């Protein structure tokens, strides 16, 4: 008959085994989503999710109350696998798309997305803004497992990566649910990332999504070619600054913005009027203006 010492050791081994089995079961549950119940509106109801987060706009922090053009954009993204967005500066398109990713990351276990930006500074800034959105949600069930400007992971939920579009990036794309190329017209590696992503996305079928958004950067680049392409399955969306109510209600907004930024007529046509021809001679660096 085993003595007390042996029983104690046996009990410790049994407890350790029990802990391991629980950990494995938790991993399986997270991977499969079994038993998961979304506490927030899903992507199809993004217009209800957005106001749960707070954003910085016009120098203040307040709940994200999306405009109709932003609601229409997310609705079209939900309904299409491939979306390309031509936009003016300062229309909040990048933050809107990332809010959609945040919604999916919090409501779909195993969800993953990658957002590629022009530089590490750009990707870090976007990651910081979306991390702030996530942190602003008043719900104790949201638990970060990784919280940085390049990766946002939630326990039992999804992950969003924010990465610079370097030449090496195309070779390291993980299997993701959504791939976003922010300011795609300005990404030197856009075509290689796009090409590398297609086989990865094909494993997820119709659930995978590819989103490109940008202001124009002349003709001949991948973004311009896709935008001007034929009826090839791309969902083409255009967001002009005049569709943003806070700008539209001020008849002098365009004039004041142009003068404040000291823009030439050519730069204005590119950055705000979405003119591809004018942007062939770009003189206004995109990183100087908030997307």
Where are these regions (language model features)?
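Phosphate/NTP-binding elements of NTP-utilizing enzymes
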Residues: 2-291
